[in-house]
Regions:
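Acidic, metal/ion-coordinating pockets
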Residues: 1-381
């Protein structure tokens, strides 16, 4: 709820609108409320809360070739998102089409029934590129969502369901995929950003662009295209840019007063799809292959979130939007507990997350980051 205050002249004014931003969300394990409960207090406290829904929630469809397919999650698990306080989700990513058009249709239908706004996927490319618009305190926020990493089979077309996308140039000319050598934004991607953000600005006072981007399971490092495409979104008129996909957090930068969260990491990911004991051949092979490709060994205690050990350092992005349009960015530190439940971090654990974020921001080649503790968040200085 937007809060109202009285200034020293006796004039009623609104306090800043608080925007909470979460990374990848995968809820394909029962008792979704439990897995979200550790971060729910921060989500519920926000005026607007946005996450990234990684997989389709459906009992229908067949596997779509093009990437290692994620299983469809139970549609009823989305109800926990609403109960936890999420107002909107981005959908454009490498797994949203893993159960074909039926998976996208069922996911959107459930979100609509719950009153959760969404952007980034749809029955056609036009629908996938359409922004979600949220109204809060007399002001409007538009959310746009794009997949930067493929697979191309998941991209929506004029007559095929899928996700919105930003085309990248690959260094060897290969099709865009999560394992392709992605190099730079294609001219077409820049045109899409300019067109869509310009249109969104006519509908809303603030525009958030969500980019599914980055190198998975790799601490700190930004791929060559990540800063250019994030900055292109800002230049096209976006106010906030958020990234996800890597399943580990990335650095933060402020560009002309506008925050870029290059990787929010895992908002809440609990899945058995990455268990060595599961019986899906392609997923079982990926469980081992990713360890060789990215040089890590998951902590065996994290049976439902077997990611890079550094992924236990997590965060929620938080932005305060004042009456004059100014933005104050920060993070809510999060720690992931075994077997994969994220919880709000406090005390020394929060301090470790703070130090980690400052360190990986520098290691990623971004300007130095200083996070200053405050009661409601770590403020980006």
């Amino acid at each position: 709820m937007v809060r109202e205050m009285i200034d020293d002249r006796g004039v009623q004014v609104q306090s800043p609108i608080s925007i909470l931003l979460a990374g990848d969300i995968v809820l394909d394990v029962e008792d979704a409320d439990h897995w979200l409960s550790g971060i729910a207090p921060a989500v519920l406290a926000a005026d607007v809360a946005i996450g990234h829904l990684e997989v389709p929630h459906t009992r229908r469809g067949s596997e779509l070739a093009g990437d290692v397919p994620a299983p469809g999650a139970e549609p009823a698990h989305l109800d926990a998102l609403a109960r936890s306080g999420f107002d909107a989700v981005s959908l454009a990513g490498n797994h949203i089409a893993d159960r074909g058009p039926e998976g996208i249709e069922d996911t959107i239908a459930r979100l609509d029934a719950l009153g959760i706004a969404h952007a980034g996927a749809g029955a056609t490319l036009e629908l996938a590129r359409r922004p979600a618009v949220l109204q809060v305190g007399g002001r409007k926020i538009a959310l746009l969502s794009y997949n930067c990493v493929g697979p191309e089979a998941a991209w929506a077309t004029r007559n095929r369901a899928g996700c919105a996308y930003l085309k990248l140039v690959t260094s060897d000319g290969s099709p865009v995929s999560p394992t392709a050598p992605l190099l730079a934004p294609h001219t077409e991607a820049l045109q899409v950003l300019h067109s869509d953000i310009s249109a969104a600005r006519k509908l809303a006072d603030l525009v958030i662009v969500a980019l599914h981007k980055g190198i998975v399971h790799t601490p700190a490092r930004l791929a060559d295209y990540e800063q250019p495409i994030a900055h292109a979104a800002l230049e096209a008129g976006a106010d906030i840019v958020v990234g996800h996909h890597a399943h580990i957090v990335r650095g933060i930068e402020i560009v002309r007063g506008k925050p870029v969260f290059h990787g929010l990491g895992n908002g809440c990911v609990v899945t058995r799809a990455l268990s060595p004991g599961q019986d899906h051949p392609a997923r079982a092979a990926w469980v081992e292959r990713r360890k060789r490709l990215f040089g890590f060994e998951p902590d065996p205690a994290y049976t439902l979130a077997p990611f890079h050990p550094e992924a236990v350092n997590a965060m929620l992005g938080r932005v305060l939007w004042d009456d004059a349009g100014g933005l104050e960015a920060g993070v809510v530190p999060v720690h992931v507990e075994p077997p994969g439940r994220p919880v709000l971090a406090t005390g020394t654990v929060a301090g470790r997350v703070k130090d980690y974020l400052e360190r990986i921001t520098a290691a990623g080649g971004l300007p130095p980051l200083k996070l200053t503790p405050r009661s409601d968040m770590l403020v980006v200085q």
